[in-house]
């Protein structure tokens, strides 16, 4: 009898991923990225955490079509005068959903370079469920350096997931 396949879930901080990749000078193709996660890491479900902006409805539909399970966070306008910046910090949602889903997966991939996920990553490692931390670039939080053996930069497989 063959070994049973592990159930792998990815938990993606979309803003951290998108802005981190843009800071490296390229744009991510989310559909290619989803296919890469399935092919490389056997990701069964990819949860994409994103701030909800009504005018981006078609983007959300295309992400669903690409195979993401979208978890929305309500957004608020930034406090800086005249910035017009919209904020939708998804950290709490990502941690909460990774714990809600905890009994359903054998391994997790956290996609973010944000140090706010330190306690989640530490817990997943302790429970032998941390597979990878995929960071958008090399400027990830120093808090995550303790988990260096799990860290992979998106830049290493950029050619497979970039737009265009």
Task: For the regions a language model picked out, list residue spans one by one.
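Domain-level signal for Mg2+-assisted phosphodiester chemistry and nucleotide/NA-binding surfaces
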Residues: 1-90, 130, 138-139
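Nuclease catalytic cores that cleave nucleic-acid phosphodiester bonds
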Residues: 54-164
């Amino acid at each position: 009898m063959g070994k049973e396949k592990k159930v792998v879930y990815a938990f993606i901080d979309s803003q951290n991923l998108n802005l981190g990749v843009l800071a490296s000078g390229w744009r991510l193709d989310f559909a290619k990225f989803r296919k890469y996660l399935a092919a490389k890491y056997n990701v069964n479900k990819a949860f994409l955490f994103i701030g909800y902006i009504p005018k981006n409805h078609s983007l959300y539909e295309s992400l669903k079509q690409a195979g993401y399970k979208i978890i929305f966070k309500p957004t608020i306008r930034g406090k800086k005068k005249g910035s017009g910046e919209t904020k939708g910090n998804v950290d709490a949602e990502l941690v909460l959903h990774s714990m809600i889903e905890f009994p359903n997966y054998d391994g997790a991939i956290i996609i973010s370079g944000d140090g706010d996920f330190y306690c989640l990553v530490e817990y997943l490692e302790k429970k032998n469920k941390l597979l990878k931390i995929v960071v958008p670039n090399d400027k990830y939080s120093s808090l995550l350096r303790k988990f260096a053996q799990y860290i992979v930069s998106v830049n290493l497989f950029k050619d497979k997931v970039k737009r265009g």
